[in-house]
Amino acid sequence: MFGVSNHTAENYFGYLKEAFLFVGVRKFSYKASERLRNEKCYVVDVALSTERIDTFSLENLGWRLENVVCIELLRRYHHQYAEIFYYKEKSFEIDFLVAKNGIVQELIQVSYNVTSERTRQREINALLRGAKKFNCRNLTLITFSTEQTIEKDNETINVLPATKWLLESKR
């Protein structure tokens, strides 16, 4: 894309991670090669992204919220021998998956705003499909300001505003 080889880009990304400017979240898979190959990038400090043209666009606010959640998950689970992943198939994606010893403990979706029915259904359906696939009952949807409990398909989804989720003590 920019005339830089994959090898060079991987090296640069590695340097940025070593400098604690970026963190990588790997794709959840039982195959090590797939985990190593697919990594999502998050900035450690969202203030580093203020030079982006779309700083205050709704899309960027969602990206920033997802970054904040990622950093908090890494902080919460750093000493608990848990790993943070994302999961993606052709038809759905889970933003964050918390696993201990290969067993999925929690599925988390992040969406700045779920007032649009389409967005709301996309996030809920991803959690429900993930719950079924990984036999996980701990389902959370983090938003900017919405709080409610959703009961659907014999599952309970806790919808929490980011402020409340960030301030809660972890079990």
Regions found by a protein language model. Name each.
Residues F144-R171:
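Domain-level recognition of nuclease-like catalytic cores that cleave nucleotide substrates
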Residues R137-T143:
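Short, hydrophobic beta-strand segments that form beta-sheet elements in well-ordered domains
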Residues T115-N125:
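Active-site-adjacent loop/helix micro-motif of nuclease/hydrolase catalytic cores
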Residues I53, T119, I150-K152:
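Short glycine-/acidic-enriched loop or helix-start segments at secondary-structure transitions
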Residues K40, E83, N138, T156-N158:
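Conserved beta-strand segments of alpha/beta enzyme cores
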Residues R76-H79, L128-C136:
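Arginine/glycine-rich "motif VI" loop of SF2 helicases in the C-terminal RecA-like domain
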